[in-house]
Amino acid sequence: MSEKTFLVEIGTEELPPKALRSLAESFAANFTAELDNAGLAHGKVEWFAAPRRLALKVANLAESQPDREVEKRGPAIAQAFDAEGKPSKAAEGWARGCGITVDQAERLKTDKGEWLLYRAHVKGESTEALVPNMVATSLAKLPIPKLMRWGASDVHFVRPVHTVTLLLGDNVIPATILGIQSDRVIRGHRFMGEPEFTIDTADQYPQILLERGKVIADYEARKAKIKADAEEAARKIGGNADLSESLLEEVASLVEWPVVLTAKFEEKFLAVPAEALVYTMKGDQKYFPVYDNAGKLLPNFIFVANIESTDPQQIISGNEKVVRPRLADAEFFFNTDRKKRLEDHLPRLQTVLFQQQLGTLRDKTDRIQALAGWIAGQIGADVNHATRAGLLSKCDLMTNMVFEFTDTQGVMGMHYARHDGEAEDVAVALNEQYQPRFAGDDLPSNPVACALAIADKMDTLAGIFGIGQHPKGDKDPFALRRAALGVLRIIVEKNLALDLQTLTEEAVRLYGDKLTNANVVDDVIDFMLGRFRAWYQDEGYTVDTIQAVLARRPTRPADFDARMKAVSHFRTLEEASALAAANKRVSNILAKATEPLNDIVHASVLKEAAEIELARHLVVLRDKLQPYFADGRYQEALIELAALRAPVDEFFENVMVNAEEKDIRINRLTLLSKLRELFLQVADISLLQ
């Protein structure tokens, strides 16, 4: 079968930079699925993405589907004909669906009977006939939250479309995609190279676009060039560029022909906290800040132009003029804000609503202040400092700097607190109260910061659940999932002695009578335990291990973590599978028992050697393991419990649990309940697969 290279390029207006990669990757994934579903053999599928185009290149694409043999079994002969031998309605309907008459059908004989059979040789469709609809379907499935219409057309897409190139080898595949007739025309850079040219074969892409159009269509190559050139530019001025992955991706999505340039700003602006300067450079201007080897911000920045200029200094000067007013604003706000102490902003918090039913930011501040102090007392942090940090926690939201540069909340609170002479752990806590902000983010660094971060998040969880606004589907406007996971991470990774039960109860108590959900405490805890499930799955733990621990509903996160590690280790033991099966058997037996059990196992009623031996082991282990359970030494406890495999096996092989004599039967059921209770001190081992 003949194979050719296939190319599709959709030429558009500037695509959303933050979505460019996901659009291209989805386009490739969707089209690959279409090819596979159609049975079209193909080689590597490459995607290309630049600000004004999405493209796919498929190597070794078959020119048609393979021919195939089709078999359709019809009704059994007994149902296909009536007593007179005439075809039944079922047989005629089946034959009509196959495009034949009943007389034309073959017969299939098996040892189970005889059926009507249709066989046909189906010729595969050509790739040229299939591809247009496959491309259209792949584009329609792109993750585009908001579509556009343009001109008088009813066509919708993420941005207006100007060209559609569809080539199989050197042939144009005729089609109308997104309202545009396919052709071999490609548009180059807006200001460099050829604005428009034709491509002869699919194999010429993307090299022809690079050479004639001055566009680097390969997203990864463009990104790598920006990174390498920016690193070299930073080295030349004795610094290191802040090349965060997210900004690199965004800049790579903004330019077709990246040219890296270095500019500077006045050193006087370095008196402003670096975070504010970096915020405007990265967030507003898409510049890369530069730091010296000690991590101090330099009065330089690196930016990426989309054109090779004959006078690059003019571009540099233009960017310096653009950024200067923004830095001057930051300087002005910083100097103005420092004329007031942080706590002077407290009254203004009363004017800002946190949530309609839950009050203002001042109300939230009062609750955080009290809760942070309570948490500090539980974990051995400085209660006065935690209380002070809680009081000041939201004051920076009222400052000019944070109002203008919203992402500097927290960090500006830290700088202003230091200026006011607050304790260092209080100042740091104001910055770290929002940590962890995302998966893998740093945790608060000191106990006061931990207390404040937990208090802030728990107040939000208690309040929003308390008015019944649980997250639904992918909607989570108050970021409750992130808050819950943040609390759990802090408690587990910092090994804090906090119990979700008492922590949630305290957070709820501080709301007074504002909350309407009577089950708020249980709802919050269940939600947080659900976050544990997601967290440990991400960490590589099996679902049944997580369920075994969740079945015990441990509300102390550090304790939950210890149980998870213990059960995970238990699974590596030779005895694990047998004991898990035995626990499952015990669980089923006890679930069916209808008679009340004894409080203790009566030794005088034990008859069989196997049950006497099992009872002896349980007595020894019960006494031995109590300190293990009390200290959370679950791994050691399960290792000890593994020794029960032999006596448990002997018991089930030689003892009839449901004996006819009632006293013996109840005593044996009680013995099994005591066995199960020991394992349940750690987890429900019966749930392990």
From Swiss-Prot:
Subunit structure: Tetramer of two alpha and two beta subunits.
Top enzyme category: ligase
Catalytic activity field: tRNA(Gly) + glycine + ATP = glycyl-tRNA(Gly) + AMP + diphosphate
GO biological process terms, semicolon-separated: arginyl-tRNA aminoacylation; glycyl-tRNA aminoacylation
Main location: cytoplasm
Subcellular location: Cytoplasm
Keywords annotated in UniProt: Aminoacyl-tRNA synthetase, ATP-binding, Cytoplasm, Ligase, Nucleotide-binding, Protein biosynthesis
Record's keyword annotation contains Cytoplasm: yes
GO CC annotation: cytosol
EC number: 6.1.1.14
Assigned protein family: Belongs to the class-II aminoacyl-tRNA synthetase family.
GO molecular function: arginine-tRNA ligase activity; ATP binding; glycine-tRNA ligase activity
Protein name: Glycine--tRNA ligase beta subunit
PANTHER family: GLYCINE--TRNA LIGASE, CHLOROPLASTIC_MITOCHONDRIAL 2, GLYCYL-TRNA SYNTHETASE
